[in-house]
Every structure is written in structure tokens, then in C-alpha cells.
Amino acid sequence: MYKGLKIGLALGGGGARGACHIGVLKVLEANGIVPDIVAGTSAGSMVGAMYASYHNAKMVEKKYLERVESENFNDLGFRYIANSEEDESIFSQVFKQIKNQYVLMVSSNRKSIIKNERIKKAAELLFDAKQFSDLKIPLIVSATDLISGNSIIYKSGSLIDAIVQSSSIPGFVEPTYKDNRMLVDGNVALPTPVTPLKNECDFIIAINITRGMEDQPEPSNIVEISSRVRDVSVVHLNSYLLNEADFVIKPKHDNLHWSAFDKTDKFIQAGEFAAESAINNLLEELENIVNTPKKTKKETFWTRIKKRLFS
């Protein structure tokens, strides 16, 4: 539909909230917007790998729903830190305290709660591709090296290994040790992977599923306070990254926790609603770019950058 315009899609991290990406993809496809390249972080790398593998949003939805409802997925252990934001009885509150004590006890003796082998098995269930070369469209996956603090970008080689590293939540999933690196979740350094797409396409659509500070309840214990400290940094970093995108879609996910995989349908619907609300503006912007004479496109791009820097 947009011949000559290479469209990139940046899929942010956020655990179960990654299902929002599926809803957005469905709406984009329905309106003739088919990404030429995808970049994914953490949950976004999972959904990105599925989309790059099947290149069909409805197929991604079907496979994803099948897997998150399977016994194999439940065995990943997310139930240990699930955090309901709904009204709780006194018994639920007591149970939450027990869970928090459990996490603290385990973390004092180990670097993680679950082995990354479980993430590998989950990835292998979600899509058939094993190597980046098996994919139908290009995919970029980001992980984080906790030794250097750098983002590690993957475009080739083992797809499964890249996804495992990108999805290894620090302190929860076992890190990968490779080439003097300690590799964990890409969300640590690149909450929404916009920058890896900068030289790969003409127009970047970012899907932001990171919870803003206004979306979160006041922390009530040590675990939640520690988590909140990191969240502040992530929100500010993510804001910087999103400014590099040409268009941003932000699904509203009603304060649902990153481990709420039992709410997958709601996340998909949230993605659809956000995309439908934004689609007219997106289509208009794409049409304007396509109809802009090539000799002024670069000038238009820099004009937009200047507005962001000095407005």
C-alpha cells in the first residue's frame, strides 16, 4: 500500500502486556499497514519473532492464545510473583506478604528464581523458526549486558538464544553468560527498541506498553519500593526513546501487572482499541509522507527533529 516507504515497528517490553502488540498488529494489517522490519525487546521480541515468522497477525494471536493457556506455560512459575491490582480480601493481602517474603528469601541465595531453559522451551512452542534466517521479514532483538551496561543487538544467528536473552527478567530468570557478558532482559537498556531501527527503515511506529508512573499504585513494601525505583528510570529512558519514533501507539492496560497472563484477551483488546483510536492519524501521516516529493523528504525529517529539540 505504501510502495517505496519502508516501515519499521518497535515492540516494547512488558511481560504479559506484550499481548497488546498483537492487537495493534491486527489493526495495522486490517488497514493495509504491513511492517517491513520489526525490532523487539523482551515480550516484544517474542511477539516480534512470531510475527516475523508467520507474517500474519491473526495467526500470531491464535498461536499465542494457545500457548499462554497451556500447562507448559503455566510451569514457567510466574504465579510466584503475580500481583493483582484488583480489590483484595484480608486473606489475599496476607498471601501477598507471604509471596514477597518468599521472593526475598530466595533472592538472598540465588541469582534467579527460574532457569532460562524454560524461556527457551516457551519460545520453541510459539514459533517454528530457529535462526534469524528462517524468518519471513527482518527482526532485530535487543538484550542487555549487565557487565558493561550496553544494549546487545541481534540480527542474525540463533533466534532462540537471542529471544531467551532478551526475555530474561533480571532476578527472576537466569542470565546467559557468553563472551564475558552477563546477558539479561533487553528492557533494562531499551524499553522500546526504536534506536536499532533508525538506519533500517523510513518510518518507525513504536508501541509503548511500559507503565507510566501515573498507572501504578503507591508502593507498600520493600519489594514494591525497590521495583518503583527502577520504574522511575525506565519511564524517563523510555520517553527519550519514544521521541525518536515517527509515531507512537500506547495501549491502556488498566494497571494490570506484567505477570497477568490470565488477562491476555484484555491486553489484546487494549492493543486493538489503542490502534483503532490512532489509525486515522497514522494513515494521514503515512499518506503525507508518500505524497511528499522525494527531494524534500529529508528536509521534512530534519524539520520534525528540530521541532522536537527546540519546541
PLM features: residue spans?
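Patatin-like phospholipase
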Residues: 1-41, 49-311
